[in-house]
Amino acid sequence: MTKSELIEILARRQAHLKSDDVDLAVKSLLEMMGQALSDGDRIEIRGFGSFSLHYRPPRLGRNPKTGESVALPGKHVPHFKPGKELRERVSSVVPVDVADTAD
């Protein structure tokens, strides 16, 4: 689902709201979440999950074209941890083929 699809679905479900208002609300929510993460804050949405930053330490990478070793600096990356309710909903809906997950 894309952001545009989310806005469209929400606008249809909440017919009393203008599409522009739904658009503004979704964009504002995402902007606030991005700002909170960039400030180093953790975001927790009960029943859905939490967003936080994880630190990736410096490492030695490789240039895929030349094969040359490249020193990559450490960095913070966004991380999402699904909540228990979301994990249960997904596991009960999406069938897992054990043969596909085995190596």
Swiss-Prot record:
Region Disordered: start-end pairs: 62-81
Family: Belongs to the bacterial histone-like protein family.
Assembly and interaction partners: Heterodimer of an alpha and a beta chain.
Paired cysteines (S-S): none
Record-given protein name: Integration host factor subunit beta
Record carries keyword rRNA-binding: no
Gene that encodes it: ihfB
Example GO molecular function: structural constituent of chromatin
